[in-house]
């Protein structure tokens, strides 16, 4: 059956993705190798060899695990062993908060090392949020050349405006529009670090007493009261 599928895919010019999911590996298969990452890599290569023998060379590989250190190590290992395109993902990552962190660490680490060709963020959530997290990972690594880069500070004793509320409202407003090139928006809380960060952004605010300075592409446009900063 595998040979028939491989031959049909080859004739139609359709690639096949080999997916090794840690949750589907049998106990006796783990025991054949020195480590779980090694097992995942070798099992994928065994399947790739089977497809190659059947005449299919258009192959992509994914090695997914909910244990992020194993996932990272498995992809590093497979990258050493073959030149097949790699599809990155962390399986069973969980709900939005923890799952986003897992995906960002696992996928982001590998992409930063130059490993990986496509990605899939998995969350127990709306698929739209999966896409949003994936876009942010690519954006943070400079691999996506459109969308918003949003900068805001953690607040400190110098903050004199309700920065948290302002930052949340700005982020919500930005979600309604996606620019075709990277644009940076900075919402900063004080007059010490704020002006520099705000001036470096395409659009920035540096908070002060009862309001803030507005910068557009490094140019100071004026001081506005806190109630008008969002507008």
Predicted region positions:
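Catalytic alpha/beta core domains of metabolic enzymes, predominantly
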Residues: 29-176, 180, 184
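Generic C-terminus detector
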Residues: 215-231
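Nucleotide-binding motor/catalytic cores of P-loop/tubulin-like NTPases across gene-expression machines
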Residues: 191-220
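Active-site-proximal beta-alpha core segment in soluble small-molecule metabolic enzymes
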Residues: 1-33, 39
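Short, charged, surface-exposed secondary-structure boundary motifs
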Residues: 1-2, 96-99, 214-217
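Catalytic-core signal marking the mid-to-C-terminal active-site face
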Residues: 173-185, 202-203, 209-214
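Conserved, mostly hydrophobic/aromatic
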Residues: 18, 61, 110, 153, ...
């Amino acid at each position: 059956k595998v040979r028939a599928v491989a031959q049909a895919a080859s004739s139609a010019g359709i690639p096949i993705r080999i997916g090794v999911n840690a949750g589907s590996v049998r106990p006796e298969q783990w025991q054949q190798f020195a480590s779980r990452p090694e097992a995942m890599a070798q099992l994928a290569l065994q399947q790739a060899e089977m497809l190659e023998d059947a005449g299919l060379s258009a192959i992509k590989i994914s090695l997914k695990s909910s244990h992020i250190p194993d996932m990272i190590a498995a992809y590093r290992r497979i990258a050493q062993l073959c030149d097949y395109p790699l599809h990155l993902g962390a399986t069973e990552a969980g709900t939005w908060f923890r799952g986003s962190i897992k995906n960002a660490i696992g996928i982001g680490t590998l992409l930063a090392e130059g490993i990986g060709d496509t990605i899939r963020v998995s969350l127990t959530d709306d698929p739209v949020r999966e896409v949003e997290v994936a876009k942010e990972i690519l954006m943070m690594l400079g691999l996506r050349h459109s969308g918003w880069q949003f900068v805001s500070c953690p607040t400190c004793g110098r903050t004199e405006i309700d920065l948290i509320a302002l930052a949340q409202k700005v982020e919500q407003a930005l979600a309604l529009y996606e620019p075709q090139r990277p644009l940076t928006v900075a919402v900063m809380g004080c007059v010490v670090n704020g002006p520099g960060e705000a001036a470096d952004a395409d659009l920035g605010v540096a908070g002060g007493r009862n309001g803030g300075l507005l910068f557009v592409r490094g140019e100071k446009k004026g001081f506005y009261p806190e109630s008008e900063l969002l507008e």
